[in-house]
Design a protein with these regions (language model features):
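Short, glycine-/aromatic-enriched active-site segment of Class I SAM-dependent methyltransferases
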Residues: 194-219, 223-225, 230
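A conserved beta-strand element that flanks and buttresses the S-adenosyl-L-methionine
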Residues: 166
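A short glycine-rich, Lys/Arg-flanked "PGG" loop and its adjoining helix->strand segment in the class I
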Residues: 178-193
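Conserved SAM-binding loop of SAM-dependent methyltransferases across substrates and taxa
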Residues: 108-119
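Conserved class I S-adenosyl-L-methionine
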Residues: 97-107, 314-317
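N-terminal juxtadomain amphipathic helix
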Residues: 1-77, 241
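Conserved beta-strand signature within the Rossmann-like core of class I S-adenosyl-L-methionine
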Residues: 191-199, 397-401
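Flexible, glycine-/basic-rich loop-and-beta segments that form/coincide
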Residues: 246-292
């Protein structure tokens, strides 16, 4: 396979997680009887531009269906993050009623609702019908298409250039990263700013976050790779912030390469130096990741088998994509994890892809009173522990598997 950005031949493997169905392909009682589509889940490293990427097997339309079940608004932590983002950007870049904000991957309007509340004109791009409908219900204008240069040029022709674009947790989700990034260069006004948030590859590898790898994530990103890709597609990076979200993310600020309005800030240089010092521009950094992932898999499986032998009941919390990667890689089935609780009604009464574990409402947890609750979205551990603190009443304990097994 050739690199999605620079077309170099890919020869360095990062990890092989076997085969699994798309992580958001939840099953209904009807589809439970049919066979599922499994795709290999292998990740390779480009030794030229250092873009880390999944091997090509699945098409985008097989991964992001009309009933895609991830709704951003079901995480209170994420809503607070979005509200603060809008407040910070409004202040930093002097946005007002004469400005125009465009969000790519607007999801259910979780972020643009705060721009709308401030009276700033905004537009969302969201190719998934279920979440697009939820955003429209909040009064947000949505274009239901995949983003790229072609769509950006159409907006420009309609006079819809952007003062600010937001793209949160989507840069990793696009198969054609060059066309996607080029779209922002086309869409921005001359002095416009594009922000991108994505999980930081440095954390993924150093903290063993292999369960954030799934088919919908085509790319795993460092600032080193992103800066190179942006420069090749008409954008220059002028600032970067490190965020706690999703186990450690970056927010990258970019402008049109021909803008020259803002100097590159010290944060960019510092982070590039840190990535270089960690070895991210050398092959040895990426070797050994498979072994660390295998340990998590083995430790979780051993814990679940031991709990079963001891007659303990174990439930899961959070029917998240990362949980599906972990459970399928570890070969966990309903005999070891009886059910998974999720607050999102769109997921309830369905089944996790691959492992086919039933998804239920939280009420079920209170009635069943399990001995252990495995928190699958470990990045929300504190939020979930607060929300489910009542399991302590029956001496229930919380479990997370990543970066290492933790019970208590």
């Amino acid at each position: 396979m050739k690199c999605r950005h620079c077309q170099s031949e890919l020869t360095l493997p990062l990890i092989d997680l076997g085969s699994a169905p798309p992580s958001n392909a939840y099953l209904t009682p009807q589809t439970l009887q049919a066979p599922e589509k499994y795709f290999p889940l292998r990740v390779l490293v480009c030794t030229q531009c250092w873009l880390v990427q999944t091997e090509d097997f699945a098409q985008a339309d097989e991964l992001f269906s009309a009933d895609y079940a991830y709704f951003s608004s079901f995480s209170s932590t994420w809503l607070k993050h979005a509200e603060k983002y809008v407040a910070d950007m409004t202040s930093r870049f002097s946005l007002d009623a004469s400005s125009h904000i465009v969000e790519v991957a607007a999801n259910d309007g979780y972020l643009l609702q705060y721009a709308k509340a401030r009276g700033i004109p905004c537009l969302g791009i969201e190719p998934t019908t279920s979440t697009a409908d939820a955003a429209r219900a909040k009064g947000i204008e949505i274009v239901e298409e995949f983003f790229g240069i072609g769509l950006a040029q159409r907006f420009v022709a309609q006079g819809k250039q952007a003062d600010l674009t937001a793209a949160n947790n989507v840069l990793a989700h696009v198969p054609d990263i060059n066309d996607f990034v080029g779209g922002f260069a086309a869409l921005l006004k001359p002095a416009g700013v594009a922000t991108f948030e994505f999980p930081h590859l440095l954390n993924l590898i150093e903290q063993n976050q292999f369960d954030t790898i799934y088919h919908e994530h085509y790319s795993y990103l460092s600032l080193t790779a992103v800066r190179t890709i942006f420069m090749a597609n008409g954008l220059s990076v002028f600032d970067v912030e490190e965020l706690p979200t999703h186990g450690g993310s970056l927010r990258v600020y970019a402008q049109r390469k021909d803008s020259g309005k803002r100097e590159q800030g010290p944060n960019v240089v510092k982070l590039l130096e840190r990535e270089t010092a960690a070895g991210m521009s050398g092959k040895s950094f990426y070797v050994g990741f498979q072994t660390k992932a295998n340990k998590v898999k083995n430790d979780l499986t051993a814990f679940l088998i031991e709990a079963q032998r001891a007659g303990k009941r174990v439930a899961g919390y959070g029917a998240a994509a990362k949980g599906n990667t972990l459970l399928n890689y570890a070969g966990v089935r309903p005999d070891l994890l009886s059910y998974v609780v999720d607050r999102n009604p769109a997921k309830q009464d369905k089944f996790l892809p691959g492992c086919r574990i039933p998804i239920v409402a939280e009420e079920h947890l209170k009635q069943d009173r399990p001995d252990y609750v495995v928190i699958l979205p470990w990045n929300l551990r504190d939020e979930v522990v607060d929300q489910l603190s009542y399991i302590r009443e029956w001496d229930g304990q919380f479990v997370t598997a990543v970066p290492g097994l933790k019970v208590g």
